[in-house]
Amino acid sequence: MSDTVERVKKIIVEHLGVNADKVVEDASFIDDLGADSLDTVELVMAFEEEFGVEIPDEAAETIFTVGDAVKFIDKASA
């Protein structure tokens, strides 16, 4: 598992209080992990802080799953 995946999972577990086993690549923040719209905004801000990347609102609106977040961060960090 990549460093990005591990760090993203840690942030999600800390912010949403979910079991790490539920945080899989295709897990939807809202449908599978119980996040609401405020949670998703807070996750995006936490990702930005942790990885030193900027996630524009247009991009944030396309990040629905754990895998979406990892892909965006990896691309933005490259």
Curated annotation (Swiss-Prot):
The keyword Cytoplasm applies. One of its GO terms (cellular component) is cytosol. Pathway: Lipid metabolism; fatty acid biosynthesis. 4'-phosphopantetheine is transferred from CoA to a specific serine of apo-ACP by AcpS. This modification is essential for activity because fatty acids are bound in thioester linkage to the sulfhydryl of the prosthetic group. Keywords: Cytoplasm, Fatty acid biosynthesis, Fatty acid metabolism, Lipid biosynthesis, Lipid metabolism, Phosphopantetheine, Phosphoprotein. The modification O-(pantetheine 4'-phosphoryl)serine is found at residue 37. Residues 2-77 form the Carrier domain. One of its GO terms (biological process) is lipid A biosynthetic process. Belongs to the acyl carrier protein (ACP) family. NCBIfam families: acyl_carrier, PRK00982.1-2, PRK00982.1-3, PRK00982.1-4, PRK00982.1-5. HAMAP family: Acyl_carrier (MF_01217). This is Acyl carrier protein. It comes from Bartonella henselae (strain ATCC 49882 / DSM 28221 / CCUG 30454 / Houston 1).
